[in-house]
A protein has these predicted regions:
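Gly/Ser/Thr/Pro-enriched helix-cap/hinge segments flanking short amphipathic alpha-helices
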Residues: 37-38, 42, 46-57, 152-154, ...
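Beta-propeller blade repeat segments, especially FG-GAP/WD-type strand-to-loop junctions
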Residues: 38-45, 88-107, 140-155, 192-212, ...
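Surface-exposed loop and turn segments in beta-propeller and other repeat-based domains
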Residues: 46-58, 109-111, 267-272, 317-333, ...
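Beta-strand-rich domains and repeat architectures in extracellular enzymes and scaffolds
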Residues: 49-87
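Surface loop/turn motifs at the tips and blade-to-blade linkers of beta-strand repeat domains
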Residues: 58-62, 110-114, 157-161, 215-220, ...
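Beta-propeller blade termini
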Residues: 64-72, 93, 117-127, 131, ...
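Hydrophobic beta-strand segments that make up the repeating blades of beta-propeller
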Residues: 77-84, 131-137, 178-185, 237-242, ...
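Solenoidal tandem-repeat scaffolds enriched in leucines and small polar residues
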Residues: 151-153, 159-258, 262-282
């Protein structure tokens, strides 16, 4: 049986009684009129004023600009931590009330007074129930242990002096401490660089004496890495997306088999060579066939791939599915786009996943578009995707980097936050009219791996099963720790089951929709 602390069919009363703060004219007007003026189910977002923050810096910050989403004070409201590059990072504490306009205050603690930050990933590194932050830097990375009140304390960590641009973590079978990997970009110490001077990557596994490093080489300038149980056999492997701009000819995408001694999958395993200007990784079972598609952002076409068979063989399908997003869809700049962070989520709650892609020129690369709007690809009934970024109001022309689709005000709709290079951070509230039903599922475990990283959630609405893996990593230089959101169309009840990390599936249970459900492993 499930234990269900925090089972909630109604909004948290304490949250609903908090002071709302000033109601912005833009959001208030849209909230008042959206139900009358909008076409049903057409996505709509309204801009939200937030404290000023810019990701800036020279060539070492052309990449990066990650965004971490975490509840750092235990009030169930997602807070934001954005990398700053040459500026300090910022922590935006969420002060929104349920179903009301989104509000944030700058609550950056002294521990985030850091330089040269490229990204941030939340996870509970020390198993104390408070979310921590892995801060990636051009230089030594920093692990910050959360105190449960949005303040942090530096933790002992020495991962060397690298240009860090990607992170992922998991808990391997039989381990009480996390395994984590850090992806590195160009080796700044190589006098022959930067081209063909990609650094190696690092895998850190727990031992009785602490974490021990395994160097993963060759490195091909990783910009996104992700531990994922792609084969659904209970063992997460490590996927890496690499930037052809610097590896040029000898590199490729990589998938490491996490055996006792890690090894790269090869053609003998069914792995095919893929080369692209890899920026971000996102995975999701879009067609409900029990296998996750892999979506890779890049310069030019964004690479959606479908798994073939049970092995690590993938077929490119971006044009067949309408997900290539290879050029700007508004404006008169016809040069190729540059994609960064990809976030999946059902923004209309109609039961079909959508995809947001943060777009923007690296800096001033003349072969690529400068006027390069973000994409919001809406999932259609036939399995294809259609562009709605301009209709939805999120087609920003800034040079975007990290991003997140997450419910910021507890109303069951996924909102959007985006970090921009040399332009202010942007947040949009989802004000879509007549959305479908939804379910939010938060998993916790006692004593170790408190966020249940590696668990699978399946939700059956009677038509198809949505499957979701709890992971840390992917994206571009940032990620989300928190509940898993499911859009469910018209369903009023669904069946739910969990496969806890390294465990068996629970029995199916029927639960009502339109609620935040918290489940703790017995």
């Amino acid at each position: 049986m499930y234990k269900r602390p925090g089972f909630c069919e109604k909004p948290d009363a304490a949250r609903g009684q908090r002071a709302v703060g000033h109601l912005t004219a833009t959001v208030a007007a849209l909230l008042a009129t959206v139900g009358q003026a909008d076409t049903p189910m057409e996505p709509r977002f309204a801009p939200v004023p937030v404290p000023h923050h810019v990701y800036d810096g020279g060539w070492e910050h052309f990449v990066g600009g990650g965004l971490a989403v975490l509840d750092c004070d235990g009030d169930t409201r997602p807070d934001l931590v954005a990398a700053g590059g040459s500026n300090p990072p910022i922590l935006l504490r969420n002060t929104s009330d349920v179903g009301r306009p989104i509000t944030f205050v700058d609550a950056t603690p002294p521990a985030l007074d850091l330089t040269a930050t490229t990204g941030a990933y939340p996870f509970d590194a020390n198993n104390d129930g408070h979310l921590d932050l892995m801060i990636l830097r051009v230089g030594p990375d920093v692990l910050l242990h959360g105190k449960g009140d949005c303040t942090f304390a530096p933790a002992p960590l020495d991962t060397g002096d690298h240009w860090s641009t990607a992170f992922s973590a998991t808990w391997e079978a039989g381990q009480s401490e996390p395994t984590f990997a850090i992806g590195h970009y160009v080796d700044r110490a190589d006098p022959e660089g930067p081209f063909e001077a990609c650094d190696t990557n690092s895998l850190w596994r727990p031992t009785p004496m602490g974490h021990a490093e395994t160097v993963l080489e060759p490195g091909h300038c990783a910009l996104s890495i992700l531990f994922t149980d792609w084969a659904r056999n209970g063992r997460p492997d490590l996927r890496m997306s690499n930037d052809r701009h610097y590896y040029i000819r000898d590199g490729q995408e990589q998938l490491w088999a996490m055996e006792a001694t890690p090894r790269l999958y090869t053609q003998d395993d069914g792995w095919a060579r893929h080369t692209l200007w890899g920026m971000g990784i996102a995975t999701r079972d879009l067609d409900r066939d029990g296998r996750d598609e892999v979506y890779l952002s890049s310069m030019g076409d964004q690479r959606l791939m479908e798994q073939q068979g049970d092995g690590p063989a993938y077929k490119d399908v971006p044009f067949a599915r309408g997900t290539a997003a290879q050029r700007p869809y508004i404006g008169d700049d016809g040069r190729p786009s540059t994609g960064w962070h990809i976030a999946f989520g059902d923004v209309q709650n109609n039961g079909r996943d959508d995809a947001f892609i943060a777009k923007g020129n690296v800096q001033q690369m003349p072969g690529n578009a400068m006027e390069d709007p973000n994409n919001l690809l809406i999932g259609m009934a036939d399995g294809s995707f259609a562009e709605r970024g301009d209709v939805a109001g999120v087609a920003s022309m800034h040079r975007s980097r990290g991003a997140a689709l997450v419910d910021l005000n507890g109303d069951g709709l996924l909102d959007l936050a985006v970090v921009n290079r040399r332009a202010p951070l942007e947040v949009w509230q989802n004000v879509t009219a007549n959305p479908g039903t939804w379910l939010s599922v938060a998993l916790t475990q006692p004593r170790t791996n408190t966020q249940a990283v590696g668990a699978w959630i399946e939700v059956d609405d009677g038509t198809a099963i949505q499957a979701r893996e709890v992971t840390v990593g992917g994206g571009h230089a940032g990620g989300v720790a928190g509940p898993q959101h499911f859009g469910l169309g018209t369903a009023q009840t669904v069946k739910l089951r969990i496969r806890w990390p390294h465990g068996d599936w629970t029995d199916w249970q029927t639960v009502p929709t339109n609620q935040n459900l918290s489940l703790t492993r017995p």
